[in-house]
Amino acid sequence: MSEYSIFTSESVSEGHPDKMADQISDAVLDAILKDDKHARVAVETLVKTGMAIVAGEVRTSTYVDLEDLIRQVILDIGYNSSDVGFDGASCAVINAIGKQSADIAMGVDEAENKDMGAGDQGLMFGYATNETDVLMPAPIYYSHRLVEKQAELRKSGAHAWSRPDAKSQVTLRYENGKPVAVDAVVLSTQHAPGVSQAQIHEAVMEEIIKPVLPAEWLHSNTKYHINPTGQFIIGGPVGDCGLTGRKIIVDTYGGMARHGGGAFSGKDPSKVDRSAAYAGRYVAKNIVAAGLADRCEIQVSYAIGVAEPTSISVNTFGTGKIDDGKIVELVKEHFDLRPRGLIEMLDLMRPIYRKTAAYGHFGRELPEFTWEITDKADVLKAAL
């Protein structure tokens, strides 16, 4: 973190239209994997006023009632009435899903005594830092927690005036590579008509910002921007078209680490865009948990149809306790980063993905999120 004295990250709530699309895509993936763990799935979603469109490629032996599923996801998020601008019970649902290309399947499927090839070429990054307990960058971690708290209060009825769409942004000041103060915080929440800005400001400050952000980081010069436009009644898919895969920085490290460009949601684990990024997080987190470095970024790359990664590289940004090249050797020794290997290592052929589609794929230590486990830390620590 030595290259920055101030750093900003943002997050969005589950009711943001792009996150709606991600959740729908991952709900479709989960429903298919539940009955067919060997299915091939690549599903994209678009949501706009009065409609949800799903498209993509699938190969599966199971049947899913997509219309009912998609409606339920929208209702679960909180879009259940025309009063909030979108109603999962009455919106149009359009299905444009086709079959997976036989050419792609040929390169990816396992033949007898042969490793599964990568589902596509590409490069993926994993990252960890010891600036938070969950080994995530603090700006993105707290940005997620703010909008997660907004949703919690909305759903509980404590903020009955609040609506599903919301965004947050946190700017932290760093000293010697560690966060020490909040320079600015932004929280915009969609709301019902007739609610005063004074009421919104007080509720957001006292019941969202102060309970979430560390008190010692808030100071007299911290800048607070709560619904800075003054009104946020029109939101969700009415305000903006939502698409799967448009929040890839929100999904990962808030811009503090590099990104290979591939989105996650709607993709089964044979797509290394997703599975290798999860494995990269697992590797980097274990390296930092082991004390081999304060910060660690790993890059892996693949060729379609080829099992072995075309490259593995590690950067500890000068914080490593041993040489980065030695860490690469430890990674190759203790982590199987072939597509089949990382799927088995992290038990990814499960219907666990809808939970990942809001509030961050990384830094949430849920039982299903195997890539957050630090079970390799002890064996890596032996290298010190």
Curated annotation (Swiss-Prot):
Q: Give the binding site residues for L-methionine.
A: 57, 100, 240, 271
In this chain, K(+) is annotated as bound at 44
Tell me the cofactors it needs: Mg(2+); K(+)
- Organism source for this protein? Teredinibacter turnerae (strain ATCC 39867 / T7901)
Which family is this sequence assigned to? Belongs to the AdoMet synthase family.
Known catalytic reactions: L-methionine + ATP + H2O = S-adenosyl-L-methionine + phosphate + diphosphate
Primary localization class, coarse: cytoplasm
Q: Which domain of life is it from?
A: Bacteria
The record's GO CC annotations read: cytoplasm
* Name of the protein: S-adenosylmethionine synthase
**Stated role:** Catalyzes the formation of S-adenosylmethionine (AdoMet) from methionine and ATP. The overall synthetic reaction is composed of two sequential steps, AdoMet formation and the subsequent tripolyphosphate hydrolysis which occurs prior to release of AdoMet from the enzyme.
Q: Where located? A: Cytoplasm
According to the record's subunit comment, the protein's assembly and interactions are: Homotetramer; dimer of dimers.
E.C. numbers: 2.5.1.6
Q: Which NCBIfam families match?
A: metK
Instruction: Tell me yes or no: is Electron transport among this UniProt entry's keywords.
Output: no
For this protein, the record's Gene3D superfamilies field holds:
3.30.300.10
Q: Name one GO molecular function term.
A: magnesium ion binding
Query: What are the binding positions for Mg(2+) in this chain?
Result: 18
Quote the InterPro entries the UniProt record gives: ADOMET_SYNTHASE_CS, S-AdoMet_synt_C, S-AdoMet_synt_central, S-AdoMet_synt_N, S-AdoMet_synthetase, S-AdoMet_synthetase_sfam
The note on cofactor binding and number reads: Binds 2 divalent ions per subunit.
Binding residues for ATP? 16, 165-167, 240, 246-247, 263, 267
